[in-house]
Amino acid sequence: MEPIKNIPRLCRTLGYEFNEKAFLDQALTHRSASNKHNERLEFLGDSILSIVISDALYHQFPAATEGDLSRMRATLVCGKMLAEIAIEFKLGDYLKLGPGELKSGGFRRESILADAVEAIIGAIYLDSDIENCRQLVLNWYESRLKVIEPINQKDPKTLLQEYLQKYRKPLPVYRVAHTEGDAHEQTFTVECIVEDLSQAVVGVASSRRKAEQSAAAQVLELIKK
């Protein structure tokens, strides 16, 4: 486990000065490094992020349907987007990781970076209040909220299903072919089977849902050629 570096610089990047540095310390601590890790803060931050982004989208798009709002929110709060924010903050430089995670490059892993962003949101909430969280999250997401649109936010599984239904084809079948790793860091291999392709298409990701989306995206590319 490495010591946390240059916390004042991180606070300036986040736009928030902690009253209780212990909250930030815990938010940056992965379960591989200590029993006092960031998973409970991540749980809290995930809920706060969801309500802040939901509220912002609700007011920004008064004519959008519930489905459009849900898809835009899913795009904005997904692990990939959170990891992008973490990279902008150079969050990997500050994470506390156990020896195994350090050796395997955990400070670059999308899931660890995304979880840390949510944990920091939870830490800020406990250190201040929901309004501070709201303003900070909106600041972090300002450029992303400016460009998000109700169109083209459907996930690959939805797009694939709609495409197949349009041409009266059977719906895809998803099957978990393989899982590996510990419970908290599993890798899922999922097969997507469609009538028009002779072989199943494989998606690999850190969750079953993400692996299914990856496989669906590949199938779409293949059948539209």
Swiss-Prot record:
Principal location listed in the UniProt entry: cytoplasm
Keywords: Cytoplasm, Endonuclease, Hydrolase, Magnesium, Metal-binding, mRNA processing, Nuclease, RNA-binding, rRNA processing, rRNA-binding, tRNA processing
Domain (RNase III): residue spans on this chain: 7-129
GO biological process: mRNA processing; regulation of gene expression; rRNA processing; tRNA processing
Cofactor(s) the record lists: Mg(2+)
Signal peptide: none
Presence of keyword RNA-binding: yes
Enzyme class: hydrolase
PROSITE patterns: DS_RBD (PS50137), RNASE_3_1 (PS00517), RNASE_3_2 (PS50142)
Domain of life the protein comes from: Bacteria
Catalytic reactions on record: Endonucleolytic cleavage to 5'-phosphomonoester
Residues of the DRBM domain: 155-225
Active site positions: 46, 118
Subcellular location: Cytoplasm
UniProt EC number: 3.1.26.3
A matching Pfam family: dsrm
Residues that bind Mg(2+): 42, 115, 118
One Gene Ontology term of the molecular function aspect: ribonuclease III activity
Role: Digests double-stranded RNA. Involved in the processing of primary rRNA transcript to yield the immediate precursors to the large and small rRNAs (23S and 16S). Processes some mRNAs, and tRNAs when they are encoded in the rRNA operon. Processes pre-crRNA and tracrRNA of type II CRISPR loci if present in the organism.
Assembly mode: Homodimer.
Family according to the record: Belongs to the ribonuclease III family.
HAMAP family per UniProt: RNase_III
Protein name listed in UniProt: Ribonuclease 3
Annotated source species: Shewanella pealeana (strain ATCC 700345 / ANG-SQ1)
